[in-house]
Swiss-Prot record:
It comes from Nitrosospira multiformis (strain ATCC 25196 / NCIMB 11849 / C 71). One of its GO terms (molecular function) is electron transfer activity. Residues 1-11, 64-69, 163-168 are cytoplasmic. This is Disulfide bond formation protein B. It is found in: Cell inner membrane. It is a multi-pass membrane protein. Residues 29-46, 88-143 are periplasmic. GO terms for cellular component: plasma membrane. Belongs to the DsbB family. Disulfide bonds join C38-C41, C101-C129. The gene is dsbB. The chain crosses the membrane at residues 12-28, 47-63, 70-87, 144-162. The keyword DNA-binding does not apply.
């Protein structure tokens, strides 16, 4: 007997694993490569956390159609939000003159959140959003983040729309 939720559960586990890997790499860049996160980076980290934890909850809960769609819808909203933030940061990297110097209201707000006090290494913003110190294949970190958010959004929409009686 085939479990109709198995493909969906595999995707949810892959989404969680991908988000955990991206967060782990962000911490590596911060702690080993000394690349401080800016306010927009911290918001993207929060989005990756929200997507990953929602996927993990969906994986363990294995809900029926309505619950699966709620989990997938939340993941899609978090992915689109994170993607928009990543695109905004990519724009700031390309047009740094549009960025104001000094402490931004976003930085002050994020650093005042309980999350930043509870886990400052993960959620405290100290970097400059327009600073480019890392590139891979001619793409900056915000570019790659936007790509990963698009992939996560596409997977979330697939989970949202897939029929549960689909067989492997």
């Amino acid at each position: 007997m085939s479990n109709p939720m198995r493909p969906v559960r595999s995707i949810l586990l892959a989404i969680f694993t991908g988000c955990a890997g991206l967060i782990g790499y962000a911490l590596y860049l911060q702690l080993v490569e000394n690349l401080l996160p800016c306010p927009l980076c911290v918001v993207q980290r929060m989005a990756y956390w929200l997507i990953g934890l929602t996927a993990l909850a969906g994986f363990f809960h294995t809900p029926e159609t309505t619950g699966r769609r709620i989990y997938a819808g939340l993941m899609a909203v978090f992915a689109f939000t994170g993607g928009l933030v990543a695109l905004r940061q990519a724009w700031l990297v390309r047009y740094p003159e549009a960025f104001e110097c000094g402490i931004s209201p976003e930085e002050a707000f994020l650093n005042a959140l309980p999350l930043a006090r509870w886990w400052p290494v993960m959620f405290e913003a100290n970097g400059d959003c327009a600073d480019v110190t890392w590139k891979f294949a001619s793409l900056t970190l915000p570019d790659w983040s936007a790509i990963f958010f698009m992939i996560l959004a596409a997977l979330s929409i697939y989970v949202l729309l897939v029929r549960e009686n689909q067989r492997e």
